[in-house]
Swiss-Prot record:
It is found in: Membrane. Ca(2+) release-activated Ca(2+)-like (CRAC-like) channel subunit which mediates Ca(2+) influx and increase in Ca(2+)-selective current by synergy with the Ca(2+) sensor, stim-1. Required for Ca(2+) and IP3-dependent contractile activity of sheath cells and the spermatheca. Affects brood size and somatic cell function. The keyword Transcription regulation does not apply. Residues 147-153, 227-237 are extracellular. This is Protein orai. It comes from Caenorhabditis briggsae. Its main location: membrane. It comes from the Eukaryota. The keyword Cell wall biogenesis/degradation does not apply. Residues 62-75 have a biased composition (Gly residues). PANTHER family: CALCIUM RELEASE-ACTIVATED CALCIUM CHANNEL PROTEIN 1 (PTHR31501:SF7). The lineage of its organism: Eukaryota, Metazoa, Ecdysozoa, Nematoda, Chromadorea. It holds the Pfam family Orai-1.
Length: 300
């Protein structure tokens, strides 16, 4: 007889199927509702949801195992507490002073963002202005033609002024070139170097826009005098150099007025913010008094 029609094997499969059918349990929704209703009537306690496992699981023995060591109930309670604590999310541990914050320190607020944008704009303006004026001074020094009749003290003055002009602008260009890439790389965050290098940013701005421009005016006057003296007409050199004196005075005056107006505007804005904050606090205090007064009268 073929193996597929073996009566003993067929009988064995039937017995196994009947056994599985006997062990199968069927639970309906009505059975669950009935069990819950029965539990409510018997216990009378509110239904507490089972704690779901969260992050950072701990072993059951970690929940206060050092307490109640002497008794069995204490051990059971500790095990239960440890299990419950292992299913809850742990609170983040507070950072101590010894911990090093290696993460990103976040973005700046509005006032600090204004300082960041201002420092970035100052560095960009300093780099452009310094590169332009330093190159112009070097070209003038090289392209000027000098004769034997040119005054030697005048050549010394020209060399000194040109050296100072190029040195000041190169210093400003160096500082702006070194700081600006790191500011653009870090972005408007607390990791930006403008917070600690504010002195160098202001120094670069001072060299490029104040000292550098004044030296550039002096350089133009000396070049005029050298050029017109070389052609035998020093009177034109005197006139053009004299015209630069009121220009320099106006330059210094405008620089002072712009700086003064900027400072006064900043102080005025700060005063307005303080006054607005005081008004807000006064209104809030009056609201609190108005809400507290009726309750006090009722209590009396």
């Amino acid at each position: 007889m073929p193996r597929s029609h073996d009566p003993s094997r067929v009988e064995l499969l039937r017995q196994e199927g009947s056994t599985m059918n006997e062990k199968r349990v069927s639970i309906s929704v009505e059975d669950i509702r009935g069990a819950v209703a029965t539990w409510k009537t018997t216990s009378g306690a509110p239904i507490t949801p089972y704690p779901l496992p969260q992050f950072f699981l701990q072993p059951p023995s970690s929940g206060g195992g050092s307490r109640n060591v002497g008794g069995g109930d204490g051990a059971a309670g500790n095990s239960k507490n440890g299990s419950m604590n292992s299913l809850r999310m742990q609170a983040y541990a507070k950072k101590t002073d010894d911990d090093v914050d290696l993460g990103h320190r976040g973005e700046l607020d509005l006032s600090e963002k204004y300082n960041y944008d201002l420092s970035k704009a100052q560095l960009k303006a300093s780099s452009r202005t310094s590169a332009l004026l330093a190159g112009f001074a070097m070209v003038c020094l090289v392209e000027l033609q000098y004769d034997d009749s040119t005054s030697k003290p005048l050549l010394i003055v020209l060399g000194v002024v040109t050296s100072l002009l190029v040195s000041v602008h190169l210093l400003a260009l160096m500082m702006s070139t070194c700081i600006l890439p790191y500011m653009e790389a870090t972005g408007c965050t607390q990791d930006s170097p403008h917070l600690k290098l504010k002195f160098y940013i202001d120094l670069s701005w001072l060299f490029s826009t104040c000292i550098g421009l004044l030296l550039f005016l002096v350089e133009i006057g000396v070049i005029f005098y050298v050029k017109f003296t070389a052609v035998g007409y020093p009177t034109a050199g005197y006139i053009t150099t004299a015209m630069l004196i009121p220009v320099g005075i106006v330059f210094v005056l405008f620089s002072y007025l712009i700086h003064k107006n900027r400072v006064s505007h900043s102080l005025g804005r700060f005063k307005d913010k303080v006054d607005t904050m005081k008004q807000f606090l006064d209104v809030e205090a009056n609201l609190q008094k108005s809400t507290i007064a009726p309750s006090t009268i009722r209590d009396i």
